[in-house]
Amino acid sequence: MMANIWWSLPLTLIVFFAARKLAARYKFPLLNPLLVAMVVIIPFLMLTGISYDSYFKGSEVLNDLLQPAVVALAYPLYEQLHQIRARWKSIITICFIGSVVAMVTGTSVALLMGASPEIAASILPKSVTTPIAMAVGGSIGGIPAISAVCVIFVGILGAVFGHTLLNAMRIRTKAARGLAMGTASHALGTARCAELDYQEGAFSSLALVLCGIITSLIAPFLFPIILAVMG
């Protein structure tokens, strides 16, 4: 057991940084470090019989670092404060519309495909951070665990393909790119933005926070409306 725990942290770091080197060298979207780490580590754990609990205990320090990492996102916001003040009305409008669209589209598609209201409620908060999504999903009758899975899936999609899509649409403005990524793919999209550009990361962080607040406030009122319209 101790051997399994000891290897968890170096395994995670080696795979992640190796994936970063590959991504920097080949510039291929699917070489996203998070995605590569999952593709490598999950089969490794299954093949070796190491339980997730053992793996998590060994790499728990990385989980503990998430809290200061989130707090550190406030610094880029402070650096861009003058631009945020100048555009605050547009920023709030964009985040509000983006949050509503994210909730309506995912939930509506799920209902059209025959999903139960419980599953639809779980999918609704897919574009916000995991703790908020689990709380919101549970409060409107969903299953928090499914909400968490949806958040991870959407975040990976955004981190892997988000910038490719923005480039294809010829969206070049840093603020617009950051707001789009933060609104659509929460923390994982924000992390990707922060890797590529300081200003993008700042605006993505702002969208991450605002969309979490907006979603938690309007989801309880919006979900019954979606059910009534789609039902």
From Swiss-Prot:
Record's subcellular location: Cell inner membrane
All ranges on the Cytoplasmic side of the membrane: 23-29, 112-118, 161-208
Superkingdom: Bacteria
Keywords: Cell inner membrane, Cell membrane, Membrane, Transmembrane, Transmembrane helix
InterPro entries: CidB/LrgB (IPR007300), YohK-like (IPR005261)
Membrane topology: Multi-pass membrane protein
GO-annotated cellular components: plasma membrane
Membrane spanning stretches: 2-22, 30-50, 91-111, 119-139, 140-160, 209-229
Periplasmic side: 1, 51-90, 230-231
Similarity-based family: Belongs to the YohK (E.coli)/YwbG (IPA-22R) (B.subtilis) family.
PANTHER family for the chain: PLASTIDAL GLYCOLATE_GLYCERATE TRANSLOCATOR 1, CHLOROPLASTIC, PUTATIVE SEROTONIN TRANSPORTER
Alphabetical list of NCBIfam families matching this protein: CidB/LrgB family autolysis modulator, PRK10711.1
The protein, known as: Inner membrane protein YohK
Gene: yohK
